[in-house]
């Protein structure tokens, strides 16, 4: 988490890119909007999502509370968000009385185990995963009101996406002698659903409810491309880690 202090009262353009998921993953979404500071030295707080990994620690800004390590599984990309208070990762704003502290969110991409494609980060809705392995399960993208549904085989454990965090599924593996996780959904306003065996997880949704003149572009949108974080070009989705740019547009 980083603190940004707006030096002067005025209008600021906020831009966020979510992170890409792990392996054959969806790319991160993009959000932008205008925020007005009425005072000098006004603080904002930024969490930049971390790219999803393979068989490892959950990504920053996409960490389930009860998971410290994804055994035999893929991690979804973390969302990127800007808030008016310092509470850390987006999941800490889940209660209704804290959500108005969130200005903007860009959803992270879902991961994919084996073959297929994880869903891209939103957009208002994250995109569904697309598994191509026979029997592979599909995670749904997160929306503005709920987390994506996690797809699992009968008897597997399923945790759906939730506010700020992607879902996941798993089964106990006799061969590994521990839980075998599949693909985790991307983080977001609401996280994408995960998938168990050979599955593709959904992307997390984005949010622009705390800014004016906002727009959001999904990580797979080829008709309306995202700007690159350096502002020099355009792209179809954010690869790797997320990003954030804050630009002062005018002074009061």
Predicted regions and their residues:
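Surface-exposed ligand/attachment interfaces on beta-rich extracellular proteins
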Residues: 1-6, 167
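Extended extracellular/luminal ectodomain segments enriched in beta-structured repeat modules
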Residues: 6-13, 38-43
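Secretome/extracellular-domain signature
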Residues: 26-137
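Extracellular interaction modules
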Residues: 97-99, 234-243
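Short, structured beta-strand segments at or near domain termini in extracellular proteins/domains
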Residues: 105, 238-252
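Contiguous ligand/interfacial binding patches
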Residues: 163, 194-239
């Amino acid at each position: 988490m980083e603190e940004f202090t707006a030096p002067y009262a005025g209008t600021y353009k906020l831009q966020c890119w979510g992170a890409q998921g792990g392996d054959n993953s969806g790319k991160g979404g993009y959000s932008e909007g205008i925020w007005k500071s009425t005072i000098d030295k006004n603080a904002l707080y930024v969490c930049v999502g971390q790219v999803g990994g393979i068989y490892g620690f959950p990504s920053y800004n996409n960490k389930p509370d009860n998971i410290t390590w994804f055994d035999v599984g893929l991690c979804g990309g973390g969302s990127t968000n800007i808030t008016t208070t310092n509470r850390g990762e987006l999941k800490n704003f889940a209660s209704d009385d804290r959500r108005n502290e969130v200005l903007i969110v860009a959803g992270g991409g879902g991961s994919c185990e084996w073959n297929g494609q994880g869903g891209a980060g939103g957009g208002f809705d994250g995109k569904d995963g697309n598994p191509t392995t026979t029997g592979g399960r599909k995670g749904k993208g997160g929306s503005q009101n709920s987390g994506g549904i996690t797809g699992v085989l009968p008897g597997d454990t399923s945790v759906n996406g939730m506010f700020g965090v992607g879902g996941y599924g798993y089964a106990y593996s006799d061969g590994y002698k521990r839980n075998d996780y599949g693909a985790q959904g991307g983080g977001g306003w609401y996280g994408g659903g995960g998938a168990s065996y050979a599955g593709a997880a959904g992307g997390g949704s984005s949010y622009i409810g705390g800014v004016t003149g906002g727009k959001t572009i999904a990580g797979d949108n080829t008709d309306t491309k995202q700007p690159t974080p350096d502002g020099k070009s355009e792209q179809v989705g954010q690869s790797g880690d997320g990003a954030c740019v804050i630009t002062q547009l005018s002074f009061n």
